[in-house]
Amino acid sequence: MPNYDASSTNTSKRANVKYKDLDLDFGRNTVTSDVNKLTDVEAVKRSVRNLINTSHFERPFHPEIGSSVRAMLFELMTPLTALNLQRKVQEVLVNYEPRIKLVQIAARPNYDSNAYDLSIYFYIIGSNELINVETFLERLR
């Protein structure tokens, strides 16, 4: 007979896992008057964006979570900087987002806007759909 308690982990390999996160826009659910929840793909997309935009020491009690992507935006725009940006994004996502399997990261310099167009392609674990997250990284003072 299996022993189920709060310290055991789920070793199930089922394909349809439901992911939930809070909506950080803090929109109100009209039925429950609670904060809206993001589910599945939208929750994972929001988490990916948040990890990229989080700097080290920004999260209380978890200073190790974050990336130096924002600091890299103040460097010269060269192909080498774009490659380093891709590596930093890959590092933070591999280390802190276990729900995804990365396929490709593309950072394209936009010289006119002095920013980068960042495209991230990944699969959500347990899903066969290729997800694309595109974001525009620019310097903020």
Regions found by a protein language model. Name each.
Residues 1-86, 91, 103, 108-141:
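Immediate N-terminus of the mature polypeptide
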Residues 94-102:
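Short secondary-structure junctions
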